[in-house]
Amino acid sequence: MNRIIFCTFLQKKSEGQDYPPYPGKLGEKIYNQISKIAWKEWKLQQTKLINEEKLNMFNQNDRKKIEKYMKLFLFNNE
C-alpha cells in the first residue's frame, strides 16, 4: 500500500517515500514531508549541480555543499 503524505515541496498530497532516502534526522524529515515526485526532481537537480560545479562526492566539503543545496531546494520556505 502506498503512503500518502502532504508534500511540502509540491504543496499537495502525494505518494511518500518507501524509506528514508537520506540518513539521520534530515532523512526522516524528507521521508515524512517530501514525495517521491519531489525527490525525483531533486535527484535531477542534484545531478546538474554535481556536473556544473564539478563536485566530487568523495570530498566531504562537496557532500556538505550538496546537502545545503538539497535543503534549500526541498525546504526553501523554512
Swiss-Prot record:
Database matches in InterPro entries: Fe_traffick_prot_YggX (IPR007457), Fe_traffick_prot_YggX_sf (IPR036766)
Question: Would the keyword Transferase turn up in this protein's UniProt record?
Answer: no
According to its UniProt entry, the protein's GO biological process terms are: cellular response to oxidative stress
* One annotated GO molecular function: iron ion binding
Alphabetically sorted, this entry's keywords are: Iron
Q: Which GO terms describe its cellular component?
A: cytosol
Q: Which domain of life is it from?
A: Bacteria
SUBUNIT field: Monomer.
Name of the molecule in the record:
Probable Fe(2+)-trafficking protein
Q: Which organism is it from?
A: Buchnera aphidicola subsp. Schizaphis graminum (strain Sg)
Question: Lineage of this protein's species?
Answer: Bacteria, Pseudomonadati, Pseudomonadota, Gammaproteobacteria, Enterobacterales
